[in-house]
C-alpha cells in the first residue's frame, strides 16, 4: 500500500473512527484501525465488536493494499504533524511508514485479515431519514438510559418507526425522556440501540444529509456516501412505557427554566449525596425549595411561578430534574403532577417545533 493524503482530512477521519476503538481489550487487533485503499481513496475502520465505524477520504493511491495500525499512536502522531501532505507506505502486512515534511515515523501493525469483518447488512431493504431528525431524537433522549447492568434492556434507547411518526424513548425506571417527530416513509419497525452507537451517529453525520438505514440479523447500519456506523442491537421486549405516562395530572406549574435550574443547583449543595432529595412546595404563585440533610445542614429558596391547582409538597431527585432541564429547548417549562407519589411530567412550553417532547420523573418520598 502506497498513497499520499491531506493531513487535515486524515486527522479528521482518524478522530471520527477512533471513538469506536475500545480503551482496553483482550484482543490486540481491536486497538488498531484498519487502513485499506478503495477506488475513492482510503477507508479507515474501527470497532469494539458492538459498534463499528468506517469512513472514506480522498487520497492519491499509487498502489493498493491494507494494514491495521495502533489507533491511539497513529492519531497522536497525525495530530502533531505540520500542515503538509502525508505519505503512507506499508511494508508487508505489519509495518507502515509515515512521512510529512521532515517528520518520519514507522509503526508496527497487524495483518488486515485479523481485523473483524463488519456485520452483513443488506441495504436493498433500507429506508431513509433526514440525519437532522435522528440527531434531534438522540440528543433529547439518550441521556435518560440506565447505566446499571441489572436490566440490560434499559441500557438502550428504544427507536420506534410508525406510520406517521418516529420516536425515541429512554428510561432508567426513575426518569424517562420521549421525543417524536413526523415521519413520511413507508418503513415500520422498532429497535433498542446502545447510546454509544447513537452518539456516533449524532456526531458523524451532518444534519443536512439523508441517512440510509438497514437492519441485519442483529445489527442496525447507518450510512451516508462516505461514512458508515454499525451497531449491535439489544434484544428483548422494551417495557410498556406508555402506561406509566400520566394523562390526568391536574396540577400545572409554568416555570422559568433558568431560574428553576439556578435554584436547584443551590439546593444541590446541601442535598444528600445518595438521594439528592429536594422538597418542592407549590402554592398559588410561589414555589418553595427546601433541603434538610442530617450531619450537613439545610437550605431554603423561593421562586415566583404561575400555578394552577391545590397546594402540594412533593420530593424529587434534584439531579434528575437538572439533567432534564438541560435538554429542555424552551425558556419556560410546563411541570405537571397529581399526587406526591405519582409521576410528574416536564414539557417545553410554547415550543414552535414540529417535534413533541416529554420527560417524566418519579417523585421521592418525603421524610419529616
Language-model-derived ranges and their functions:
Residues 1-368:
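Structural preference for solvent-exposed beta-strand-turn elements
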